[in-house]
């Protein structure tokens, strides 16, 4: 039987948590099946567990957190989890002081204005008493402190510089990696400009599993643990990935069942998919999943979490651009990216 685009099964399966008929499954349909109520609770528990295990908010003075909303199904899920957690009046209440960052990569002014208008509507029903800020990925190009304004898209004056830098990278693989690193720099600069030390991003398990393989191919195998696990601590900034154990499929089913996918909006620029390490990784994972190797992502992530760099970076030396542990000031991948950009990257950073 099909419910929307989500596979269900009514042929005698029982929920693993209660005695009701099971209709929904997680990543692997050969394993646990759930009724609707237990499936929703299972996904919520994964989110809360990722935060509680690391005791991220044990310090009462460091609860200010930037919540990144990128318009995707995972971004929508994250937004609603924070909203629900703040409404709790028991021990389940999440002790966090959120500021929502709407991260945009669109370049047309009319599209950006439509996003701002849509955000005004969403704010009426989700986190209405929280500060919202709209910013473009081009904020990564600021070389000095800047003040964020409300009710407008910050960083639009830097879009041409951002596009010029991305276009200057001639190798598709390095271009995609440059975009990823610039996104992290954008988040860090925005957080620092607001005096916030923590940033919660909507990266789900599928994204992180693919990222782990990408980074192996780019020669960063010793650093993939920090890139795909819950916390990524940096000198003045921490990235938090509370969706790292939740698959894209689970998020899609949850959003559908809870009727929150209506808050997904188009924020990201669609780029031409030239052949690169990243596109090949995606094709490789899709092939395995189509051949019913459902646990591929889980296996990759569980293995990646155990890999730690023991030969270099013992003195906490980091790449000055991407922040991975290296023996030198710049990792080999970032050095290659700098060469591809014709030294434009060196001039800017």
UniProtKB/Swiss-Prot annotation:
Gene Ontology terms, MF aspect: nucleotidyltransferase activity; sulfurtransferase activity; tRNA binding
Ranges annotated as spanning the membrane: none
InterPro entries the record matches: CTU2, Rossmann-like_a/b/a_fold
Listed pathway(s): tRNA modification; 5-methoxycarbonylmethyl-2-thiouridine-tRNA biosynthesis
UniProt-listed Pfam families: CTU2 (PF10288)
GO term, biological process aspect, one: tRNA wobble position uridine thiolation
Intracellular or extracellular location(s): Cytoplasm
GO cellular component terms listed in the entry, alphabetical order: cytosol
Keywords assigned by UniProt, alphabetized: Cytoplasm, tRNA processing
SUPFAM superfamilies listed in its UniProt record: Adenine nucleotide alpha hydrolases-like
Role: Plays a central role in 2-thiolation of mcm(5)S(2)U at tRNA wobble positions of tRNA(Lys), tRNA(Glu) and tRNA(Gln). May act by forming a heterodimer with tut-1/ctu-1 that ligates sulfur from thiocarboxylated urm-1 onto the uridine of tRNAs at wobble position.
HAMAP family listed in its UniProt record: CTU2
Record PANTHER family: CYTOPLASMIC TRNA 2-THIOLATION PROTEIN 2 (PTHR20882:SF14)
Family from the record: Belongs to the CTU2/NCS2 family.
Name of this chain's protein: Cytoplasmic tRNA 2-thiolation protein 2
UniProt source species: Caenorhabditis elegans
Native organism taxonomy: Eukaryota, Metazoa, Ecdysozoa, Nematoda, Chromadorea
